[in-house]
Design a protein with these regions (language model features):
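Structural and coupling elements of P-loop NTPases
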Residues: 1-531
């Protein structure tokens, strides 16, 4: 296969949703149909004690929530599929944001009973800002749900994107029996699922005009379907490929990830419509995926994927050129040459060594601490720099220190590694030895921090909540002693030695700004390429 053909067959996408919409389950079912796994283990199925393939960290298995982004790959129908499974919990929006920076399209998962929820809105906004195509999968249609017309209206009003249903749920008053495929004018009815969604199912199919289908559905349901089809054809948005690619129209699919219903048709249509790797803006130029000069963007760092070795793996998305095992590349931020040995690809904790990879692919490489999230790797002869990722301002703060002072070294190492991952933001208060101030966007992050330090580094934490909810970065050099009105604030340094003011609330911050008119306070720190 030529280099160009390899690039064109890549599909790299992220799945975004509110917690509990069924994201991890959908990810698993896509892997099931892609042949990457042969038996899907439901997160919630306690009987078999199976855990979702993409939830690999111990705390995720226990709680049934995704707190790290997994990277999963499989081949289907000639396409090489890279799924970026993002954290569903709202406290991990920063990790999710970074993952979306590595995706070429997004699948928005919506619970048919709940519609558009808070986290979906936030993640949708990020996807829209990136200008990537967004596909909608309305999940759980095997349960009682809202009217699909209501959902279409809600998506259009709340998210500001037009919808085009590719299939349509068949039923009356929120009780659905199957789906109608609009393009092929066929009906597919739910099959009775005795395997609880662990295996692929054959379902009952037939043409809309098939008398047997009318008989199976019953007169009332069949007539309701005909009425819905007519209304959709007259009042709905027609399918427009260019609008989908521009992120102005979202193709809608209905199904049930738990029972595998509608997953295969969705996967096939999605792969047909979703884009191959897109050009990416660097500071110097627009980088074309078909360029032969290698470039990659670090979007995630994960410490301790193998708890026995305390390893640190840097995940990068290849943006251009062909990757070959053992190749040497330039790390732009340190200007050092790095040899990329032992590159890996993952199905959760299952690793395979990669010989080569192409634009759109995600690979993980071992790193001793040189690279950071948002860094660029490129060919020596053709230097490019991708822009940094934004930092989400933390809203919760705590001072953490080791209960056992003899574990100071493990504490320092653990905190540094977890901060490099972006799991939390850490700050140091001058003079406060053996402790860090930790900033998070949600309380669950503190729980995960405590859990991981204990389980991965053997450190029990002392955790004291601090009375601050606002962080402001000071732009430029300022004599801290001359700042006015900061008696009740805390002055700290972030991991890049930038000065940060932590203060109790926005009103107090406004007062400090008034007292210091010559000082610029930033909500987020300036990025590398803005300096």
């Amino acid at each position: 296969m030529t280099f160009l053909e390899e690039v064109q067959r890549r599909r790299t996408f992220a799945i975004i949703s509110h917690p509990d919409a069924g994201k991890t389950t959908l990810t698993e079912k896509l892997l099931l149909y892609g042949g990457a796994i042969h038996l899907a283990g439901s997160v919630k199925s306690r009987k078999t004690a199976k855990h979702a393939v993409s939830d690999w960290m111990e705390i995720e298995k226990q709680r049934g929530i995704s707190v790290t982004s997994s990277v999963l790959q499989f081949d289907y129908d000639g396409c090489r599929v890279n799924i970026l499974d993002t954290p569903g919990h709202q406290d991990f929006s920063e990790d999710t944001y970074r993952t979306l920076m590595a995706a070429d399209s997004a699948v928005m998962l919506i619970d048919i009973a709940k519609g558009v929820e808070a986290q979906t809105k936030k993640l949708f906004a990020v996807s829209k800002e990136r200008g990537i195509p967004i596909f909608t999968f309305v999940n759980k249609i095997d349960h009682f749900g809202r009217s699909p017309f209501d959902l279409m209206e809600e998506i259009e009003n709340v998210l500001g994107i037009r919808t085009c249903p590719m299939n349509w749920p068949i039923g009356i008053n929120g009780e659905y029996k199957g789906v109608y495929d609009r393009e092929h004018e066929t009906i597919e009815l739910f099959a009775k699922d005795e395997t609880h969604g662990q295996e692929k199912l054959a379902s009952e199919k037939g043409a809309l005009t098939d008398p047997r289908m009318k008989e199976l559905l019953g007169d009332d349901v069949y007539q309701a379907l005909l009425d819905d089809i007519e209304l959709l054809d007259v009042a709905g948005d027609p399918f427009d490929f260019d609008k989908v690619r521009a992120g102005e129209l979202t193709p809608m699919f209905f199904g049930s990830a738990m029972t595998n219903f509608g997953v295969k048709p969705f996967l096939e249509k999605f792969l047909e419509l979703a884009p191959s790797p897109a050009p990416r803006q660097a500071v110097e130029e627009m980088v074309q995926p078909t360029s032969e000069d290698f470039s990659a963007l670090v979007f995630k760092i994960q410490a301790n994927m193998d708890p026995n070795h305390h390893d640190r793996i840097v995940f990068m998305r290849i943006c251009s050129g062909k990757f070959e095992k053992g190749m040497s590349v330039l790390h732009r931020q340190s200007n050092k040459t790095i040899r990329l040995s032992q590159p890996q690809q993952f199905l959760a904790t299952e690793r395979t060594i990669v010989e080569d990879a192409y634009p759109g692919d995600i690979i993980g490489v071992f790193d001793a601490g040189t690279m950071g999230v948002g860094d660029t790797l490129c060919a020596q002869k053709h230097k490019v720099t991708f822009g940094d990722f934004p930092v989400f301002p933390p809203e919760f703060f705590a001072r953490v220190s080791p209960k056992d002072t003899m574990k100071r070294k493990q504490f320092q190492k653990g905190m540094t590694q977890l901060a490099q991952e972006g799991a939390v933001q850490i700050f140091e208060q001058p003079g406060a030895l053996d402790s860090f101030v930790v900033g998070a966007v949600g309380m669950l992050q503190f729980e995960v921090l405590e859990y991981r330090l204990k389980n991965e580094y053997g450190v029990d934490l002392l955790n004291n909540t601090l009375p601050y909810s606002v962080a402001r970065w000071i732009d430029g050099e300022v004599d801290i002693a001359s700042l006015k009105g900061v008696d009740n604030a805390m002055i700290v340094k972030d991991n890049r030695d930038r000065t940060v003011v932590l203060i109790s609330n926005e009103w107090q911050m406004g007062w400090v700004q008034e007292r210091n008119p010559d000082v610029t306070f930033l909500t987020t720190p300036k990025l590398h390429h803005e300096l």
